[in-house]
């Protein structure tokens, strides 16, 4: 059985041979492919009337394929193009009656040759300009209307339908095609409201274009873009229905991004809806890999009352806020909360919730970021509770990897009496901290900042040789030589007073202290050190002494 071509099937036409129709061979460039059967009785796609399967089966025609196509809901799109009123849109769409301005162009009657196409183009240009205000008023601003009309007209040029095809019909066809696609889209959207197992199911589904679009029609490609834009502009209710709830949507990567977009770009109602949906699950979403971003966004845009509601839920149980602060994702929410709280009530809630777990916050990487945010965004008076805890637990905090860093920030952010108390406590324990893998950094910090350095020197006096031979303590001694000139004579005297000075020269750490002392000291102090080094010139070829003698520091 022969089939007529489908509108838009241009890519496949080249693979078929033009055999003509009704005994008239096609030699024009207009037809470029399918065998166009003129038998309107046996071709179901050219028969605009209801297909009489009984008579065809009686004539021995195999209707298997047609019946299968009917079950697949594949209809004759050509009939849709020429008989709008025959499709009722299942109660949603009513076809419009075609209205023609003037008579049809003679180039559309019967076979269309090259000259006819040329005349048709001229006629189309004239009619397009003449009817521009009426037939094309709904497409103002689209400079490609003429080319689209020409494309649709040439596509239907070989149609033997006596009703012909004019530019007005092109416009109507395009209107009908877009409205039909919109109708199909609405049906598909209604179907997509059924809850799916996968939260991404809604986004993975796409509205199938008309069957003729598979042939590569440019007009239908444009329609597909239009449909995509409509999908992108879906409202919050539609998106939430596809996931089932805002809670489930917030725990999905793509869904959370969409919700953040609604919070950023949506109206007040959208923000209120999202807030009311997540407020009861703010603890779980705040520690979720994706949900925490939505909670942060809500904290930024919500008002003080809503922000207080979030804070009340995060502090509803003792130690809960500390637990969230230590969480890899929850710490971001707490930090954002600290950045945005402004009222005394909110700050009081934060302070009272963090105090019970202070040591945990100082020792943990995520927790110390929360403390740093408090130091940065709270006033010195509001940070008093942090500085008091830092002073009280100075050694416990300073001897941890992250705690020593937080204490350095506490020193820099503190002022007045709290600053003095904290520095005095660090200086008082400087000998112990100087020998610690992490505490030595805190001692070096206050030496560099020259805060409490005199007290540090007092605590280290008499222990410079011991510290010089240690991996961590040697760094503290070098810092004293560099930043406190008054300490140099005391340090050198302790070094040269050692009975086995050669041992210090060959020590992997002490040799660096001696090099630093030779470069920083002057006068009598330096002369005494050089004299001591010369006595061990026979050691200059040893691995560590080689560095001292190669620099010729002792010869200056």
From Swiss-Prot:
<dbReference type="Pfam" id="PF00806">
    <property type="entry name" value="PUF"/>
</dbReference>
<dbReference type="GO" id="GO:0005737">
    <property type="term" value="C:cytoplasm"/>
</dbReference>
<feature type="repeat" description="Pumilio 5">
    <location>
        <begin position="389"/>
        <end position="424"/>
    </location>
</feature>
<feature type="repeat" description="Pumilio 7">
    <location>
        <begin position="460"/>
        <end position="495"/>
    </location>
</feature>
<feature type="repeat" description="Pumilio 2">
    <location>
        <begin position="277"/>
        <end position="313"/>
    </location>
</feature>
<feature type="repeat" description="Pumilio 6">
    <location>
        <begin position="425"/>
        <end position="459"/>
    </location>
</feature>
<dbReference type="GO" id="GO:0006417">
    <property type="term" value="P:regulation of translation"/>
</dbReference>
<keyword id="KW-0677">Repeat</keyword>
<comment type="function">
    <text>Sequence-specific RNA-binding protein that regulates translation and mRNA stability by binding the 3'-UTR of target mRNAs.</text>
</comment>
<feature type="domain" description="PUM-HD">
    <location>
        <begin position="215"/>
        <end position="556"/>
    </location>
</feature>
<dbReference type="InterPro" id="IPR011989">
    <property type="entry name" value="ARM-like"/>
</dbReference>
<feature type="repeat" description="Pumilio 1">
    <location>
        <begin position="238"/>
        <end position="276"/>
    </location>
</feature>
<dbReference type="GO" id="GO:0003723">
    <property type="term" value="F:RNA binding"/>
</dbReference>
<dbReference type="InterPro" id="IPR033712">
    <property type="entry name" value="Pumilio_RNA-bd"/>
</dbReference>
<protein>
    <recommendedName>
        <fullName>Pumilio homolog 11</fullName>
    </recommendedName>
</protein>
<feature type="repeat" description="Pumilio 3">
    <location>
        <begin position="316"/>
        <end position="351"/>
    </location>
</feature>
<dbReference type="InterPro" id="IPR001313">
    <property type="entry name" value="Pumilio_RNA-bd_rpt"/>
</dbReference>
<feature type="repeat" description="Pumilio 8">
    <location>
        <begin position="496"/>
        <end position="531"/>
    </location>
</feature>
<keyword id="KW-0810">Translation regulation</keyword>
<feature type="repeat" description="Pumilio 4">
    <location>
        <begin position="353"/>
        <end position="388"/>
    </location>
</feature>
<keyword id="KW-0694">RNA-binding</keyword>
<dbReference type="InterPro" id="IPR033133">
    <property type="entry name" value="PUM-HD"/>
</dbReference>
<keyword id="KW-0963">Cytoplasm</keyword>
<dbReference type="InterPro" id="IPR016024">
    <property type="entry name" value="ARM-type_fold"/>
</dbReference>
